[in-house]
Amino acid sequence: MGSFEVDSLEGGSIPAGTNVIGHVIVDAGAALIGATSTFGRIEVTPVIQNAQYVSGNDMGGLISFTMPRTASGLIQSVGVQFIGGATTAVNVFLFDANPTGSTFTDKSTFTIVAADEAKRINKVGLSLTPVAVVGDAVTGATIDNYAKPFNSTGTIYMAVVSTGTFTPASVTDMRVNITYQQGAQ
Protein backbone atom coordinates (compact mmCIF):
# COMPACT_ATOMS: atom_id res chain seq x y z
CA MET A 1 0.00 0.00 0.00
CA GLY A 2 1.38 3.41 -0.90
CA SER A 3 1.60 6.43 1.33
CA PHE A 4 1.65 10.18 1.11
CA GLU A 5 2.58 13.01 3.40
CA VAL A 6 2.09 16.76 3.41
CA ASP A 7 5.02 19.00 4.22
CA SER A 8 3.54 22.19 5.69
CA LEU A 9 5.00 25.68 5.63
CA GLU A 10 6.94 26.14 8.81
CA GLY A 11 7.61 29.49 10.43
CA GLY A 12 7.15 32.59 8.39
CA SER A 13 4.80 34.13 5.97
CA ILE A 14 4.13 33.46 2.33
CA PRO A 15 5.68 35.96 -0.08
CA ALA A 16 3.25 37.99 -2.22
CA GLY A 17 2.29 36.16 -5.42
CA THR A 18 3.10 32.69 -4.04
CA ASN A 19 0.53 30.07 -4.95
CA VAL A 20 2.13 27.09 -3.21
CA ILE A 21 1.83 26.29 0.46
CA GLY A 22 4.14 23.37 1.19
CA HIS A 23 4.21 20.33 -1.06
CA VAL A 24 2.89 16.78 -1.22
CA ILE A 25 5.20 13.79 -1.38
CA VAL A 26 3.60 10.71 -2.93
CA ASP A 27 5.02 7.21 -2.84
CA ALA A 28 4.63 5.40 -6.18
CA GLY A 29 2.24 2.80 -4.74
CA ALA A 30 -0.30 5.29 -3.39
CA ALA A 31 -3.88 5.30 -4.61
CA LEU A 32 -5.14 8.86 -4.39
CA ILE A 33 -8.56 10.40 -4.75
CA GLY A 34 -8.62 12.24 -8.05
CA ALA A 35 -5.91 10.05 -9.59
CA THR A 36 -6.39 9.15 -13.23
CA SER A 37 -8.75 6.21 -13.79
CA THR A 38 -9.36 4.10 -16.86
CA PHE A 39 -12.92 3.19 -17.82
CA GLY A 40 -13.70 0.64 -20.49
CA ARG A 41 -15.68 -2.26 -21.87
CA ILE A 42 -14.21 -5.53 -23.09
CA GLU A 43 -16.22 -8.06 -25.11
CA VAL A 44 -15.09 -11.60 -25.91
CA THR A 45 -16.64 -14.21 -28.21
CA PRO A 46 -15.48 -17.56 -26.83
CA VAL A 47 -15.75 -20.65 -29.02
CA ILE A 48 -18.53 -22.94 -27.80
CA GLN A 49 -20.09 -26.05 -29.29
CA ASN A 50 -23.20 -26.20 -31.44
CA ALA A 51 -24.38 -29.12 -29.31
CA GLN A 52 -26.57 -29.60 -26.27
CA TYR A 53 -25.34 -28.15 -22.97
CA VAL A 54 -26.86 -29.35 -19.70
CA SER A 55 -27.04 -27.76 -16.26
CA GLY A 56 -23.57 -27.46 -14.73
CA ASN A 57 -21.68 -27.39 -18.05
CA ASP A 58 -18.93 -24.83 -18.50
CA MET A 59 -19.47 -22.78 -21.67
CA GLY A 60 -16.38 -21.66 -23.56
CA GLY A 61 -13.75 -22.80 -21.06
CA LEU A 62 -11.86 -20.21 -19.03
CA ILE A 63 -12.47 -16.81 -20.66
CA SER A 64 -9.80 -14.09 -20.32
CA PHE A 65 -10.23 -10.31 -20.37
CA THR A 66 -6.89 -8.52 -20.79
CA MET A 67 -7.00 -5.28 -18.83
CA PRO A 68 -5.17 -2.13 -20.01
CA ARG A 69 -3.38 -1.80 -16.66
CA THR A 70 -2.35 -4.00 -13.76
CA ALA A 71 -4.00 -1.67 -11.25
CA SER A 72 -6.90 -2.67 -9.03
CA GLY A 73 -10.37 -1.34 -9.74
CA LEU A 74 -14.09 -2.11 -9.95
CA ILE A 75 -16.05 -4.38 -12.26
CA GLN A 76 -19.01 -2.13 -13.13
CA SER A 77 -21.14 -4.58 -15.14
CA VAL A 78 -21.19 -8.15 -16.43
CA GLY A 79 -23.13 -9.24 -19.50
CA VAL A 80 -23.87 -12.35 -21.58
CA GLN A 81 -25.61 -12.44 -24.97
CA PHE A 82 -26.64 -15.22 -27.32
CA ILE A 83 -27.02 -14.14 -30.93
CA GLY A 84 -29.18 -17.20 -31.70
CA GLY A 85 -31.65 -16.51 -28.90
CA ALA A 86 -30.93 -19.00 -26.10
CA THR A 87 -33.20 -18.30 -23.13
CA THR A 88 -31.53 -20.39 -20.46
CA ALA A 89 -30.10 -18.91 -17.28
CA VAL A 90 -26.36 -18.91 -16.66
CA ASN A 91 -24.06 -18.40 -13.71
CA VAL A 92 -21.02 -16.21 -14.29
CA PHE A 93 -17.93 -16.63 -12.10
CA LEU A 94 -15.28 -13.87 -12.10
CA PHE A 95 -11.68 -14.24 -10.89
CA ASP A 96 -8.92 -11.64 -10.45
CA ALA A 97 -6.14 -14.26 -10.76
CA ASN A 98 -5.89 -17.42 -12.84
CA PRO A 99 -7.81 -20.20 -11.04
CA THR A 100 -5.27 -22.85 -12.07
CA GLY A 101 -6.55 -25.66 -9.84
CA SER A 102 -10.11 -25.68 -11.20
CA THR A 103 -11.57 -27.33 -14.29
CA PHE A 104 -12.75 -25.08 -17.15
CA THR A 105 -13.43 -27.35 -20.12
CA ASP A 106 -16.13 -26.37 -22.60
CA LYS A 107 -19.24 -28.57 -22.37
CA SER A 108 -17.90 -30.40 -19.31
CA THR A 109 -18.90 -30.21 -15.65
CA PHE A 110 -17.64 -27.02 -14.05
CA THR A 111 -15.72 -27.50 -10.82
CA ILE A 112 -13.90 -24.99 -8.67
CA VAL A 113 -11.45 -26.13 -5.99
CA ALA A 114 -11.16 -24.54 -2.55
CA ALA A 115 -7.70 -23.13 -3.35
CA ASP A 116 -9.21 -20.99 -6.14
CA GLU A 117 -11.99 -19.50 -3.99
CA ALA A 118 -9.66 -16.71 -2.80
CA LYS A 119 -9.21 -15.66 -6.45
CA ARG A 120 -12.96 -15.44 -7.07
CA ILE A 121 -14.41 -11.93 -7.28
CA ASN A 122 -18.02 -13.11 -7.26
CA LYS A 123 -20.71 -15.28 -8.84
CA VAL A 124 -23.59 -13.68 -10.77
CA GLY A 125 -26.79 -15.40 -11.91
CA LEU A 126 -28.21 -14.07 -15.20
CA SER A 127 -31.55 -14.98 -16.84
CA LEU A 128 -31.42 -14.42 -20.60
CA THR A 129 -34.33 -12.57 -22.23
CA PRO A 130 -34.87 -10.94 -25.66
CA VAL A 131 -32.80 -7.77 -25.93
CA ALA A 132 -33.72 -6.51 -29.40
CA VAL A 133 -36.77 -5.62 -31.45
CA VAL A 134 -39.44 -8.21 -32.18
CA GLY A 135 -38.25 -10.64 -34.82
CA ASP A 136 -34.57 -10.48 -33.80
CA ALA A 137 -33.33 -13.57 -31.99
CA VAL A 138 -30.71 -11.96 -29.72
CA THR A 139 -31.11 -12.65 -26.01
CA GLY A 140 -29.01 -11.48 -23.12
CA ALA A 141 -28.71 -10.23 -19.60
CA THR A 142 -26.51 -7.68 -17.87
CA ILE A 143 -26.02 -6.76 -14.26
CA ASP A 144 -25.25 -3.04 -14.00
CA ASN A 145 -24.00 -1.03 -11.02
CA TYR A 146 -22.16 -4.16 -9.95
CA ALA A 147 -19.19 -2.34 -8.34
CA LYS A 148 -17.18 -5.41 -7.33
CA PRO A 149 -13.55 -4.62 -6.46
CA PHE A 150 -10.70 -6.58 -8.01
CA ASN A 151 -6.92 -6.73 -7.72
CA SER A 152 -5.76 -7.20 -11.29
CA THR A 153 -2.67 -9.04 -12.39
CA GLY A 154 -3.48 -7.72 -15.86
CA THR A 155 -6.23 -10.24 -16.64
CA ILE A 156 -9.75 -10.87 -15.33
CA TYR A 157 -10.98 -14.44 -15.80
CA MET A 158 -14.57 -15.59 -16.34
CA ALA A 159 -16.42 -18.89 -16.40
CA VAL A 160 -19.98 -19.10 -17.76
CA VAL A 161 -21.94 -22.11 -16.50
CA SER A 162 -25.30 -23.27 -17.88
CA THR A 163 -28.14 -23.76 -15.40
CA GLY A 164 -30.41 -25.49 -17.92
CA THR A 165 -30.46 -27.60 -21.08
CA PHE A 166 -30.15 -25.88 -24.46
CA THR A 167 -28.25 -25.94 -27.76
CA PRO A 168 -26.44 -22.78 -28.98
CA ALA A 169 -27.18 -21.72 -32.57
CA SER A 170 -23.48 -21.68 -33.59
CA VAL A 171 -19.93 -21.95 -32.22
CA THR A 172 -19.77 -18.13 -32.00
CA ASP A 173 -23.26 -17.67 -30.54
CA MET A 174 -22.20 -16.45 -27.09
CA ARG A 175 -20.78 -12.98 -26.34
CA VAL A 176 -19.56 -12.01 -22.87
CA ASN A 177 -18.52 -8.58 -21.64
CA ILE A 178 -17.42 -6.59 -18.64
CA THR A 179 -17.21 -2.87 -18.02
CA TYR A 180 -14.65 -1.68 -15.53
CA GLN A 181 -12.94 1.21 -13.82
CA GLN A 182 -9.25 0.91 -12.96
CA GLY A 183 -7.20 3.23 -10.81
CA ALA A 184 -3.85 4.72 -11.82
CA GLN A 185 -0.84 2.43 -11.76
Q: What residue spans do the PLM features occupy?
A:
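Extended, low-complexity segments enriched in Ser/Thr/Gly and acidic residues that occur primarily
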Residues: M1-L62, M67-I83, V161, T165-Q185
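Short loop/turn segments at connectors of secondary-structure elements within structured domains
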Residues: A86-A89, S152, S170
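Residue-level detector of short, conserved catalytic/binding motifs and their immediate flanks
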Residues: G73-Q76, V90, I156
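Cysteine-clustered segments with highest specificity for TGF-beta superfamily mature ligands
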Residues: V24, V133-T167, M174
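Extended, solvent-exposed segments with strong compositional bias
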Residues: I112-K148
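Surface-exposed turn/loop modules enriched in turn-prone residues
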Residues: I83-K123
